[in-house]
Amino acid sequence: MPRDIPVGNGRLLVTFDHKYQIRDLYFPHVGQENHAGAGPCRFGVHSDLPGKGGKQLLSWTQDAAWTIHQRYLRDTLTSSVTLDHPDLKLAMYCNDCVDFHRPIMIRKIKIKNLADHDRVVKVFHHQDFNMFGTKIGDTAYYDPELRGLVHYRAKRYVMVTFFQSGEQRIDEYATGTSGFHGAEGTWRDAEDGHLQGNAIAQGAVDSTIAHHVNVPAGEEKTIYMAIIAGHSREELLELQKWLTKMQPQGVIDRTGAYWRLWVGGTNINFGNLPPKVVELFKRSLLVLRTQIDNGGAIIAANDSDIMQFSRDTYSYMWPRDGALVADSLDLAGFPDVARNFYTFCQRVITKDGYFYHKYNPDGSPASSWHPWVIKNERAMPIQEDETALVVWAMWRHYFRYRDIEFVRPLWVDVVQPAAEFMCRYRDIRTGLPLPSYDLWEERWGVHAFTVATVYGGLKAARNFAVCFGDREKAEKYNQAAEEIKAGAAKYLFSDKLDRFVRRLVPKDSPVPPDDHEYRERENLVADEEIEDIYEVDETIDASLYSVFKFHLFEADDPRVISTMKQVEEKLWVKTRVGGVARYENDYYHRISNDIAAVPGNPWFICTLWLADYFITRAKTPADLKLALPIFEWTAGHALESGVLAEQVNPYTNEPISVSPLTWSHATVVSTAIKYLEKLESLQLCNTCNQPIFRMRRQGPVEVKSQATFDRFEAEFEITDSREVFSAVGQFVKNDPRSGQKFQAALAIDTRDCIGCEVCVAHCHRDVLKMVDGKALIDLRNLNACDMDGECVEVCPTDVVSLIIRPAEDSTPPEMPKPLLNTK
């Protein structure tokens, strides 16, 4: 079941399912210690049923009668949830957020009475908490000093309470046994609209609280619910004191302002990316931040429902996922978050220079299914691409930010040990890496993806060595990389298939017996073929994009072109949903056995890899547009909230597996940035050959001089209503030069507008303004247009049009097509 809404701050993460029930509550680490994983925390209301003779009803939001829409407030990590119950004649509008600094979640509940009489509405919330992730030895009790219901065990405390009109209070409560000896929980106690008031329970426990609200006919009332997490009762008291002073609405206001500032801080010009894609880009950045622990661990996903399939979760740090996510954050302009991840890697890398399968957020090795013995010989239980990608990402970070003081210890503690490991963990017969597990964590062998990433990692290590003046290591790492490239060209490309193969599986198990001894191998003799020592896995796999992604071979190489053409043709899902599958006959969460039409479920990352390929090969802005339908496909298949799952149902588009998947959102970010950077390199002025489009806008508070710095005063943002801006405007005006009356139509094709601001700069009447990175018409000032057409002449991408006719001509000016009205 997907998590439609995650909200968090790096210490406290709370997730909601499609029925608007809390399903996960992680504290104090994101992804570790899920205190709400036992079952749904129900949310509901109790009131009379209008027209039913005084009959009463309690309805939880999981009931089918509710219509629920879950979104976020724009550019924030504050939810925007609407709930409607036609039988109860009640509607609710809710906002949820976690304070950007403190472990406090606030829910604002606005209740509207749609009946024609005054009513008492009881709001119920059920807590099915299990401290430390297990229902053993917990206590739930009502605390009169805290005026809340507290669950605790050892150094984990969670309190729930209500606020209304500045007053904190709970009107009813109950604690009891849950999930033991057939006890379903205290939510059953609420079904008659009353709670028994049991003040304490111990063992396998749950609780329910209620707040009574008097709502006049046709009016609405607002209350708040707060969830506070801490390490002790004393800490809860301090946080309660702070919240009482700040008030819940203050938390919502300050948290919304923080995340708007955070996501907008890079001042990116989104060029001609469609508005829905821009919105998904920003949402992806915000969702990414919810999945990252403040200690540096980037968690793959926090959706505990996956436990029903394997009794384990995705709530771990995979170095591969983490490296790719950190790289996307570096690209987007968030190096501080990425640095925390690189420092985490510095703490956990083994002394022999490789990373284990995955890690817990606290840095300890996590559960694994990779064996230490294969074919009766000791094996490395690793995915070598994870080691390579960390080094690859670190180099890209340094190259972009040049923070030499930061990377100096990483060069010593991470890059060198990892590079030495990658150099020696190779089959001397082929030059290729020795076997390990693949990125899909399913198969053992020598994988094209791993080969490409190890090549990229060694090239990155070579660059570090050059920067640090170590000629010997630079030559060593480069030589190993070139040997890998030669081996890939010789052994991984199939002339028969005219493409790269997925993997090689050794017949004689060339696996090192331990971490230090690597057995010597003789080179292949003249008449020996690769098939004599390796079995070739010819399966077409979307991860073959790696051969150009990590520059093992360039995207214009005929071998790469042929490979990617076959990936697109054979792995595109041939249903109305579309998208790219991982590989042919993918079994993971399989929906269809029609392999010809549905080779596997469509994955967001695999589909975006195809866009990456189109972007890499683009030579003109027109070539670049081949990627736009894939961006639009991604945005169109997200949940209503903008959350992306790992994969979707090929027939219904329902999310499958975990949701959100951090890697999915990171791939949106990195691919979009790559698109914009490529657009900047292609959209050049014909006169000066300089970029017309620039991805990075000038910051609104950029300091240009000491005088500017001294005079600057921050102000609260004043946002014009978007209703006054449009891509199309028509008006009638007298031409002062001729005295004649004209009809005019001004239009902007926002799909191709790259946000260069040239037309806005030449509009001296304030008719054109920049809104969300696009030039739009301010309808309030439209009649001020002097109709001289300068905005049309200066537009470098020909997206501005102005059509003028004499007013006596009854035919209205024809608007250029197609147009996207972003009003």
What kind of feature is each model-predicted range?
Residues 1-5, 233-235, 248-317, 340, ...:
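Low-complexity, Ser/Thr/Pro/Gly-enriched N-terminal "stalk/linker" regions
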Residues 82-84, 88-192, 207-209, 241-271:
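Polysaccharide-binding surfaces and accessory modules of carbohydrate-active proteins
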